[in-house]
Every structure is written in C-alpha cells, then in structure tokens.
C-alpha cells in the first residue's frame, strides 16, 4: 500500500525579502520531507507565497511599484531560496497563479454547496501591522 505524506512550509508573505526565519522553517520542512521519502512515503512537499493583502499593497506603494510587479520581484527571491538551500520541494506556488485561483474557486464552490460556508456576523481583531 502506498503511503502518502503532504507537507508545506508556511506560505510566505512577500512583503519583504526572505530572512533567517524563512530559511529555518524551509529547512525543517525539508528535513521531514526527506525523512519520509527514506521511509518510502510518496511525499508532496510544497512551498510558495501568499501575494494578497494590505501589507503588500503598502510596501509596493512605498517602493513606487505596481503590487503585481512588486510580488513578481519578491516572490522570485523566495523561489531562489529553495535552490540556495537545496530544498527538495516538489512545487513552488504563488497565490496569484491561475492554477491556484482555479483550485480555490472550485473548493470554495464545493464548500458553499455543502453548507460549510455561510453568511453570518463575526467579531475579531485585525491589524495590518500584526
């Protein structure tokens, strides 16, 4: 029987260049992926960037760049980190990619149809700086 193992890094928020914390979490994830492969698991190891939100918009404005152009540049530095660290990831996904958008829409529609997503009121804390 084939044993599957799915693991991801956090999806990194490209409001700035990668730092030691990004390297650390990537290396730890890579260690788990490699270990599971040694145990003959079919491993799917993903990493990537989450390119939506106010922080990205603010940083792009500070740099006098279009948010998409800003994300293209910064995400490329995150992608290059996978090569610099010799990570064994199977894919690098950006939330602005068409394939990601298509998958999210499909999953969202399934959740709506099943009643798992519904309109209601919610109170919570949100801060761009947190």
Task: Walk through the language-model features, giving the residues of each.
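N-terminal, positively charged nucleic-acid-binding surface of large information/translation enzymes
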Residues: 1-130
């Amino acid at each position: 029987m084939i044993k599957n193992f799915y693991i991801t890094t956090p999806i990194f928020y490209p409001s700035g260049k990668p730092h030691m914390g990004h390297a650390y979490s990537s290396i730890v994830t890579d260690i788990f992926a490699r270990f599971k492969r040694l145990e003959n698991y079919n491993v799917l190891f993903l990493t990537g960037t989450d390119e939506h939100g106010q922080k990205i918009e603010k940083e792009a404005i500070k740099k006098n760049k279009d948010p998409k152009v800003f994300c293209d540049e910064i995400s490329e530095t995150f992608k290059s980190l996978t090569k610099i660290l010799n990570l064994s990831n199977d894919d690098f996904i950006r939330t602005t990619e068409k394939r990601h958008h298509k998958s999210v829409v499909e999953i969202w529609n399934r959740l709506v149809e099943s009643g798992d997503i519904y309109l209601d009121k919610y109170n919570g804390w949100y801060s761009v700086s947190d």
